[in-house]
């Protein structure tokens, strides 16, 4: 699949920009530094896809036709947390580490963002052999694949974006792991209970998730909630407390917060 890559100067704070994209249901974007060290926004449009409304007055400084494969090959393998590597181009051959391969499909989320990194950190810290894991808002499937490779017995990954579901399925096949990937509007299509629910989405969506999360968890379950801008942390904590969840551990990188929660 071919995409039009547009490069625009970053006019607003990163967290505000991410929120706007999520509100529009647009996920093919990246925030990077140009050769001068200035942050720029890259977005990727499919043929005939319109520019998100809030960007229509932004200056476009460059554009070109590209493919996801072109984008992926620019990335070198990297260690997302100690002992776990993201390998977009299959350059790593190690038996002493967990390696997550990424297919050059149609997704642009690769684990570079701190919210993904913190989620993987807590999965590695708290996941026990044989745990069951639910990944809500799975995107490319990195968290679900990591959970399975860390020893989870059953992993379910859901997303409301059909494109994300396709990409996650491709990455699951690429990594030869047993993960069920399916479409679901938050927990609408989820059945059963899980030992760990991990979700790397926006604070407002976490608030909605918390309304129903007790149905898919048990007394000893754990929540790992990431993608929370620090100024909205208290909002998530209040909603969690209303439903019987307390913060066990907190981690922050830049303005992004990840919370680990247990039942009170």
Swiss-Prot record:
Family matches, as InterPro entries: Ribosomal_L11_MeTrfase_PrmA, Ribosomal_PrmA_MeTrfase, SAM-dependent_MTases_sf
Principal location listed in the UniProt entry: cytoplasm
Any one GO molecular function term: protein methyltransferase activity
Any GO CC annotation of this UniProt entry: cytoplasm
GO annotation terms (biological process): methylation
Reaction catalysed by this enzyme: L-lysyl-[protein] + 3 S-adenosyl-L-methionine = N(6),N(6),N(6)-trimethyl-L-lysyl-[protein] + 3 S-adenosyl-L-homocysteine + 3 H(+)
CDD domains (UniProt xref): AdoMet_MTases
UniProt-annotated binding residues for S-adenosyl-L-methionine: 116, 137, 159, 200
Keywords: Cytoplasm, Methyltransferase, S-adenosyl-L-methionine, Transferase
Source organism, top-level taxon: Bacteria
UniProt EC number: 2.1.1.-
Entry's localization field: Cytoplasm
Tagged with keyword Nucleotidyltransferase: no
Family: Belongs to the methyltransferase superfamily. PrmA family.
Its biological purpose: Methylates ribosomal protein L11.
Name of this chain's protein: Ribosomal protein L11 methyltransferase
């Amino acid at each position: 699949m071919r995409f039009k890559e547009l490069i625009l100067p970053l006019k607003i704070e990163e967290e505000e920009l991410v929120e706007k994209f999520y509100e529009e249901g647009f996920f093919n974007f990246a925030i990077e530094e140009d050769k001068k060290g200035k942050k720029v926004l890259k977005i990727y449009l499919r043929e005939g896809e319109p520019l998100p409304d809030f960007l229509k007055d932004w200056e476009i400084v460059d554009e070109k036709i590209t493919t996801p494969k072109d984008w992926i090959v620019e990335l070198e393998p990297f260690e997302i947390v100690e002992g776990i590597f993201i390998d977009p181009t299959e350059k790593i051959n190690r038996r002493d580490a967990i390696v997550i391969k990424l297919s050059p499909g149609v997704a642009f989320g690769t684990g570079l963002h701190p919210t993904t990194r913190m989620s993987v950190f807590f999965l590695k810290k708290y996941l026990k052999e044989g745990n069951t894991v639910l990944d809500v808002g799975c995107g490319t499937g990195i968290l679900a694949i990591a959970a399975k490779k860390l020893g989870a017995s059953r992993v379910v990954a859901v997303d409301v974006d059909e494109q994300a579901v396709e990409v996650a399925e491709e990455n699951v096949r690429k990594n030869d792991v047993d993960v069920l990937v399916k479409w679901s509007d938050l927990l609408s299509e989820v059945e059963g209970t899980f030992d760990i629910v991990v979700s790397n989405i926006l604070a407002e969506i976490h608030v909605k998730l918390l309304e129903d999360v007790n149905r898919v968890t048990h007394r000893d379950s754990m929540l790992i909630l990431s993608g929370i801008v620090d100024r909205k942390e208290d909002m998530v904590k209040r909603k969690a407390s209303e439903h019987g969840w307390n913060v066990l551990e907190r981690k922050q990188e830049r303005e992004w917060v990840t919370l680990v929660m247990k039942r009170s």
